């Protein structure tokens, strides 16, 4: 689960541009 938590923190910066689904805006 450590990887999951790390992934959530990394995805937070990604979602700013790509959105929660991972799609580019």
Swiss-Prot record:
Signal peptide limits: none
Chain positions recorded as heme binding sites: 14, 17
Compartment(s): Periplasm
One Gene Ontology cellular component annotation held by this UniProt entry: periplasmic space
Record's keyword terms, sorted: Electron transport, Heme, Iron, Metal-binding, Periplasm, Transport
Major location (coarse): periplasm
GO-annotated molecular function: electron transfer activity; heme binding; metal ion binding
Region Disordered, residue ranges: 1-25
InterPro entries per the UniProt record, alphabetical: Cyt_c-like_dom_sf
Keyword Electron transport: yes
Keyword Hydrolase among UniProt keywords: no
PTM comment: Binds 2 heme groups per subunit.
Function: Diheme, high potential cytochrome c believed to be an intermediate electron donor to terminal oxidation systems.
Name under which the protein is recorded: Putative cytochrome c4
Native species: Aliivibrio fischeri (Vibrio fischeri)
């Amino acid at each position: 689960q450590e990887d999951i938590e790390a992934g959530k923190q990394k995805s937070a910066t990604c979602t700013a541009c790509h959105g929660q689904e991972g799609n580019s805006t």
